[in-house]
Amino acid sequence: MKIRNSLKSLRGRHRDNQIVRRKGRVYVINKTQKRYKARQG
């Protein structure tokens, strides 16, 4: 999982990427390509 300041550019890397909020943190998740996981930090 990558830790990035801005997730907007990471979301555009794959069409299945989703931005979700969990426990006050913002994540990019992808059900089909797991390597696109990222967290904002």
UniProtKB/Swiss-Prot annotation:
Keywords for this protein: Ribonucleoprotein, Ribosomal protein
Family (UniProt): Belongs to the bacterial ribosomal protein bL36 family.
Gene Ontology CC annotations of this record: ribonucleoprotein complex; ribosome
InterPro entries (alphabetical): Ribosomal_bL36, Ribosomal_bL36_sp, Ribosomal_L36_bact
Organism: Methylobacterium nodulans (strain LMG 21967 / CNCM I-2342 / ORS 2060)
Gene Ontology terms for molecular function: structural constituent of ribosome
Any GO BP: translation
Protein name: Large ribosomal subunit protein bL36
Gene this chain is encoded by: rpmJ
